[in-house]
Amino acid sequence: MNPIVINRLQRKLGYTFNHQELLQQALTHRSASSKHNERLEFLGDSILSFVIANALYHRFPRVDEGDMSRMRATLVRGNTLAELAREFDLGECLRLGPGELKSGGFRRESILADTVEALIGGVFLDSNIQTVEQLILNWYKTRLDEISPGDKQKDPKTRLQEYLQGHHLPLPSYLVVQVRGEAHDQEFTIHCQVSGLSEPVVGTGSSRRKAEQAAAEQALKKLELE
């Protein structure tokens, strides 16, 4: 991999790996090698959840568990992680197999999000919990400063349903129109039909649930509720 690209990535991350092989593994999709990033992703997912939960607990001492859970879900969901990945220009650093390269895997939200979690796992193994916690807080500073408890943190499907019920409109319908990829790495495409919108809105995700949430979020934007 191009060392100039890797050095630029590490500057954007705010962390230089002592063991470069951990960085290489974190950037490797299972389509490219048997030594891929899924175990690091598993580790990073748990670390990220803990760090964000801890930050919210101390930032909002009077907020109940339900609101904190919703805020955490907003901060650690796939599209937020994919936004971070794009801020790091992570797509140009991914190691993908020929099939994923051809199908534009370097732009796919699920792959970008999973790689951010793998990087978190890699940083932890390369350093310690204090270092990776501070790094995550640096990445999330603006988002943590801007987030607040309340209905906005309900997931998109819930907010869309409540809006439609409040206006005495039928509930949305979700239809799977495409499933791409192998069983271990699928991408679902959902059409969501909503009263008041002339055409179905489209959402994609690594599971049916995530794709439905993405479609609901697009519907909310079209209804100008975001």
Swiss-Prot record:
Domain (RNase III) ranges: 6-128
Chief place where the protein resides: cytoplasm
Domain DRBM: start-end pairs: 155-225
Keyword DNA damage: no
Cytoplasm found in the keyword field: yes
Biological processes per GO annotation: mRNA processing; regulation of gene expression; rRNA processing; tRNA processing
Binding site for Mg(2+): 41, 114, 117
Record key words, sorted: Cytoplasm, Endonuclease, Hydrolase, Magnesium, Metal-binding, mRNA processing, Nuclease, RNA-binding, rRNA processing, rRNA-binding, tRNA processing
Molecular function terms, GO-annotated: double-stranded RNA binding; metal ion binding; ribonuclease III activity; rRNA binding
Cofactors demanded by this protein: Mg(2+)
PROSITE patterns: DS_RBD, RNASE_3_1, RNASE_3_2
Active site: 45, 117
Catalysis: reaction(s): Endonucleolytic cleavage to 5'-phosphomonoester
Subcellular location, record wording: Cytoplasm
Enzyme Commission (EC) number: 3.1.26.3
InterPro entries: dsRBD_dom, RNase_III, RNase_III_dom, RNase_III_sf
PANTHER family (alphabetical): RIBONUCLEASE 3, RIBONUCLEASE III
Family of the protein in this entry: Belongs to the ribonuclease III family.
Subunit structure: Homodimer.
NCBIfam families cross-referenced by the UniProt entry: RNaseIII
UniProt protein name: Ribonuclease 3
Species this protein is from: Salmonella typhi
